């Protein structure tokens, strides 16, 4: 398996298999977070992603849930996410959930039809770091948006 930088996942993903899709954070300005401060955002090379899927298939061919690492892999383009989801499906035919971190900005940057398609392809486990529903707290945390942007 290929991992660079820090690898972190929420506790409720502890049973999920981890595959690196990105490293670093696209925003990297939150006042409370130092996890990726010295790590620029970059996408994992597709060759490494596929090699990791092949390794996972070898040891866990019936994997039903995977977690893509990085601060916000959902920042990748729709086309890249679609390709990753289809690649996961090629290697792990029983995989039902592709989970990852996403920011409000990442979700808002995508069209509704794209979100629906990605969900249908198995990207249906987004962990969204809203941190608070209070604009003053969001400003103190330097999240870069107000709560109105987090609602539909």
Can you name each region flagged by the protein language model?
Residues 44-61:
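Short microdomains enriched in Cys/His and/or Lys/Arg
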Residues 4-48:
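Canonical Radical SAM [4Fe-4S] cluster-binding loop centered on the CxxxCxxC motif
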Residues 150-152:
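Conserved small/polar residues in nucleotide/adenosyl-binding loops
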Residues 57-147:
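Conserved SAM/AdoMet-binding glycine-rich loop
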